[in-house]
Amino acid sequence: MTQPTTPDLILFNGRFTTLDRSNPTATAVAVSQGRFSAVGSDREVLPLAGPQTKRIDLGGRSALPGLIDNHLHLIRGGLNFNMELRWDGVKSLTDAMAMLKAQVDVTPAPQWVRVVGGFTEHQFVEKRLPTLAELNAVAPDTPVFILHLYDRALLNAAALRAVGYTKDTPEPPGGQILRDSAGNPTGLLLAKPNASILYATLAKGPKLPRDYQVNSTRHFMRELNRLGVTGAIDAGGGMQNYPDDYDVIQELADADQLTIRLAYNLFTQKPKEEKDDFLRWTSSSQYKQGTDYFRHNGAGEMLVFSAADFEDFRQPQPELAPGMEGELEEVVRILAQNRWPWRMHATYDETIDRALNVFEKVNEDIPLAGLNWFFDHAETISEKSIDRIAALGGGVAVQHRMAYQGEYFVERYGAAAAEATPPVKRMLEKGVNVSAGTDATRVASYNPWVSLSWLVTGKTVGGLQLTPQRNCLTRDQALSMWTENITWFSNEQGKKGRIQVGQLADLIVPDRDFFACPESDIADTSALLTVVGGKVVYGAGAFADFDESAPPLAMPDWSPVRTFKGYGAWGVQEGAPLQSVMRNAAANCGCASSCNMHGHAHATAWSSKLPVADLKGFWGALGCACWAV
């Protein structure tokens, strides 16, 4: 507690987990001028209210610091969000295809229907992708583009016509066009040896006009707020040129319409021109320029293309060029001389080892201490590399890519190799700066609770037990990875990440108790209330009337966001997609989930109005027809 000025906002009757070691729990907080001005008991905080203070009764619910994503492609994702049909969190291919059909029916020519990553075939009960025949049957005339992680893309016949791929199209560098016996493209594109063909093909699609991009970015932030995200570090991305592709996010920042605090890194765009990019950017941009809502965070995740080790575990580990070190050293010296931190994409330990050789060499001439540089991903990092990073004062930003690619990793390298991939717990034990994020929106979903679930349970979204319990994190550790730990990676330690007097007032009220709910429920969490800088940016249920930031309807009027909203198609009637596929399966299945005593009668049971009809309930989940036959 302190003696603050009259607060703008008080939240009370809650159960706050503050992450402040000197004051770990509270029931009330006060906010003044965007920062926490008091954290304590109701008895201490409520008397501070003045006539204009807004008060929100949390009704005994738990509250947490706002979640911060250490690696999110928000700027690029925001420009496209309103055009994309999201299969993130959809449990069955049957439902995914029903969504696709519904979107095809409302999408006008010449627009595409596009599913751009964020899902894996393993999340579906069918454990497969749609066939090209299925896509063509659903959409004979509307172009459909489906990106699966960064390993392949599926195009229907209409999409092949739209992009101009024919029998005469030459095989592109950085990819493979699968063809039939006559040499005609089938519609399957493979990322072999990298994803260049996937990027290039997607770029051929229509783009949203400028005002729609502004609206789209607001809706993407809104979806993140719904999931409890209050901040992120943007990692740049392919086809995201600076400053051209930053004008929309800058416009929103200038208009005070950002509902996510965003630190951004600059990603080089053209091979062999990386040095020129960073010479130009370090002379025209200043590290940390901006505000607490939108600020420059240095370089990366791409520093030089010769160091890019593609993360497709369905393909062999790539061999980096022998001249990589020279190109990387040129760029790192520029960054170190200008005191710009950097982040570097590195999937494999071999890449990390070679990059560390460069960093250690530069450190001999230009000390790297205090630069807060770090590696991204680091799935196969070794203990030796962890120690070298710690010695240089660096960090590791991990993401939940293995929750989406774990099955493929195990197929190629074996289950034992996946037990600590990446070795998050070991890095924490060694005291390395480490935090968590998603790498959304393509190679994984933007849902932070999927990441938190993966950190705690060690399971993929397909249910594979990837990480043994001894290598998993506690819920306290996982939450810190998504809050206070991330502030080192944006050089904002002490400014945010905790519910503590003086820190930025970013917090969430989740729809369940993160510390008490079953592990299997963590991934299904969303926010009832999200507060950024003392402003309610998302409110649902009992808190809907406090919402101050709802954007206008998604544009264009055929946008998938209008119908499906986002993760798990939550915009449709709650539970409807899962109920639909289960009932369809029940009518045709011969599964072994029936009651051993009373037999198998899914169709009868799940069509009834009795408790077995509730697929989320005990009896319905088991498939027992005891009460219905």
Language-model features: locations:
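C-terminal, active-site-flanking charged/polar segments
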Residues: I249, V509-R512, I522-A554
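Acidic (Asp/Glu)-rich catalytic clusters
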Residues: L252-D256, T282-F294, R333, I366-L368, ...
